[in-house]
Curated annotation (Swiss-Prot):
Protein name: Securin-like protein
Described purpose of this protein according to its UniProt entry: Acts as a chaperone and as an inhibitor for separase sep-1. Plays an essential role in maintaining chromosome cohesion prior to meiotic and mitotic anaphase, in cytokinesis and in organizing the spindle and the centrosome. Ubiquitination-dependent degradation at the onset of anaphase is likely to activate sep-1 resulting in the proteolysis of the cohesin complex and the subsequent segregation of the chromosomes. Also required for cortical granule exocytosis.
Gene for this chain: ify-1
Keyword Cytoplasm assigned: yes
GO molecular function: protease binding; ubiquitin protein ligase binding
Chief subcellular location: cytoplasm
GO biological process, one term: maintenance of mitotic sister chromatid cohesion
Coiled coil region boundaries: none
Subcellular location(s) per record: Cytoplasm; Chromosome; Cytoplasm, Cytoskeleton, Spindle
UniProt organism field: Caenorhabditis elegans
Residues covered by region (Disordered): 31-53
Gene deletion effect: RNAi-mediated knockdown causes embryonic lethality. Embryos are arrested at the one-cell stage. During the first mitotic division, embryos have defects in mitotic spindle formation, and centrosome duplication and positioning. Chromosomes are decondensed, disorganized and accumulate due to a lack of cytokinesis. RNAi-mediated knockdown at the larval stage causes in F1 embryos a loss of chromosome separation during meiosis I and no formation of polar bodies. During meiosis, impaired cortical granule exocytosis. Immediately after fertilization causes a reduction in cyclin cyb-1 protein levels.
Keyword Cell cycle: yes
């Protein structure tokens, strides 16, 4: 039985599962035969012919321990401080102060020559400072503070208007007339109408009818006044309701 070759016997090939079964019966070691199988995208994937071969392969790959690299550890030291009991003061690092050396005007101009287009003028001003002429001008410089009262007085003086001693003036009309040569006459104000008070009899508020005794004539006069008022209100209401 050991010399029998199941693949060469017969006209049909024995399935791999049956061949492995016979080999197991004969005591031979089962060898996993792998054949390339083509996937749907044209890729060749090696798969085992035995049932559960893929799961065995995945299990074997999962049991492999990946190689580990040893990393050098950095020792870290910790130190605890107690703020309440520790009186030690940490040393403060001293900061070196840069000494400022005096620089001559010529060196300053030489350094500015490569960076400033006015280096020649700066050098000339520094070397010939005493030879400069001082020009005095009567114009007011722009940087000075201008007093508004002074500027107002100058503006009034240019216009020929006399400056008021106090503000507001007591008689502005007469002062303005004097300043601008206006002649004020009483005839100019004659067109203004005078206020005239009209004398008429106002109604009396009646608090108690029993206390106020009115004659028949006075009662009729009061009723006529009320009727006139009602008529006037009716006329106003009619005018308001008229279409435009």
């Amino acid at each position: 039985m050991e010399d029998l070759n199941f693949e060469e016997r017969g006209s049909t090939q024995i399935p791999a599962s049956l061949q492995q079964h016979f080999s197991a019966k004969l005591g031979r070691q089962n060898e996993l035969e792998k054949t390339p199988s083509r996937g749907g995208l044209g890729l060749v994937v090696n798969s085992s012919k035995t049932p559960g071969g893929k799961s065995l392969q995945s299990l074997a790959s999962a049991c492999k321990v990946p190689p580990s690299t040893k990393k050098n550890t950095i020792p870290i030291a910790f130190e605890c401080y107690e703020d309440e009991t520790d009186d030690q003061i940490a040393d403060v690092a001293t900061i070196k102060k840069t000494e400022k050396h005096p620089c001559s005007p010529i060196d300053t101009a030489n350094r500015c020559e490569t960076f400033d287009s006015l280096a020649a003028d700066i050098e000339d001003d520094m070397l010939n400072l005493e030879d400069q002429d001082v020009v005095l001008s009567e114009d007011r410089p722009y940087g000075d503070v201008i007093d508004p009262a002074e500027s107002e007085a100058e503006a009034l003086a240019e216009l020929g208007v006399e400056e008021w001693d106090s503000y507001p003036p007591i008689d502005p009309a007469s002062r303005i007339g004097d300043d601008f040569n206006y002649v004020l006459r009483t005839e100019d104000f004659a067109e203004e109408g005078d206020v005239k008070l009209e004398e008429t009899r106002h109604r009396t508020v009646i608090a108690d009818i029993d206390e106020v005794k009115m004659s028949k004539a006075e009662r009729n006069e009061l009723f006529s006044m009320l009727a006139d008022d009602l008529d006037s209100y009716d006329l106003l209401a009619e005018e308001a309701n008229l279409p435009l």
